[in-house]
């Protein structure tokens, strides 16, 4: 298991944006939907962060987000 920023797909490499003020469990639900233990909205990056993701779940790499893939 790993703790990291989930991405939509490994090819696109785009994180899930969130709003710390209006999160309402969005990131926690998103992470649990990907079989993680829990998740939250990391305010400094305005992105969802997951704890306990399966090792094969796609997570952010050093490459840029490419929404056109």
Swiss-Prot record:
Keywords: Disulfide bond, Ion channel impairing toxin, Neurotoxin, Secreted, Toxin, Voltage-gated sodium channel impairing toxin. CDD domains: neurotoxins_LC_scorpion. InterPro entries: LCN-type_CS_alpha_beta_dom, Scorpion_toxin-like, Scorpion_toxin-like_sf, Scorpion_toxinL, Scorpion_toxinL/defensin. Disulfide bonds join 14-65, 18-41, 27-48, 31-50. Residues 2-66 form the LCN-type CS-alpha/beta domain. Coiled coil: none annotated. GO terms for cellular component: extracellular region. It is found in: Secreted. GO terms for molecular function: sodium channel inhibitor activity; toxin activity. GO terms for biological process: defense response to insect; envenomation resulting in negative regulation of voltage-gated sodium channel activity in another organism. The keyword Protein transport does not apply. Expressed by the venom gland. Belongs to the long (4 C-C) scorpion toxin superfamily. Sodium channel inhibitor family. Inhibits voltage-gated sodium channels (Nav). This toxin shows insect lethality against crickets. Has the structural arrangement of an alpha-helix connected to antiparallel beta-sheets by disulfide bonds (CS-alpha/beta). This is Toxin Tma2.
């Amino acid at each position: 298991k790993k703790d990291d920023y989930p991405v939509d797909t490994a090819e696109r490499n785009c994180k899930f944006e969130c709003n710390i003020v209006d999160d309402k469990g969005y990131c926690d639900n998103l992470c649990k939907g990907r079989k993680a233990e829990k998740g939250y909205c990391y305010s400094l990056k305005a992105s969802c962060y997951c704890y306990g993701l399966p090792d094969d779940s796609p997570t952010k790499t050093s490459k840029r987000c490419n929404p056109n893939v």
